[in-house]
Amino acid sequence: MPINSETAAQYLTAAISAEVEYRNHTFRNGDELHKQVASVAHWLCGMSGKNSLLLAGGCGNGKTTFVYAMQNLVNHFGIKNQVTGLNFGISLYNAKDLANICKTHPKDWRSLMDKDILAIDDLGTEPREIIEYGNVLSPIIDLISYRYEHQLPTILTSNLTPQQISEVYGKRIGDRLKETTEIVPFLNGSYRG
């Protein structure tokens, strides 16, 4: 983003607050949120040295809300992609929906693999494999591998820890994510209850 990380943190906090209020909840500011915002803002400004981001933690503690806020923030700045001339955007998909798209809409699947910034919400909730006309497909493994090979920014949210992601998706995927992904822990409790 074309701003420093401190300014990005202020904008991101405002975007999170707006998203929380949009969902008819009360925004709660605190130390844990400040750490999360600072890490994500650092990543958004390209200062982390990693091209992908993992928001990992328990249920209901704000990971998806962060992604919606990032999506609104990136849209607000209207940053142009030098290759396409179009504005960058964050495309957000639920992991279960991605598995379904892979199976039922192959053309859409192919185009979303190349999205500027792809956000995968609830990594770990989707079926690991799907069968299509006798072919066994591993949509998320294939998607993460493709985006790794092409160095495309990917945002992941998950209730799984990085270690659990390695166990579920294999050592190779875990190692690739370790290399390319800034991990932001969400250690706070659920905001839902």
Regions of interest found by a model, annotated:
Residues 52:
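Walker A (P-loop) ATP-phosphate-binding motif of ABC ATPase nucleotide-binding domains
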Residues 72-90:
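Post-Walker A helix-loop "phosphate-sensing" segment adjacent to the P-loop in P-loop NTPases
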Residues 84-148:
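Conserved nucleotide-sensing/catalytic segment adjacent to the nucleotide-binding pocket
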Residues 1-49, 183-184, 188, 193:
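A short, basic N-terminal segment
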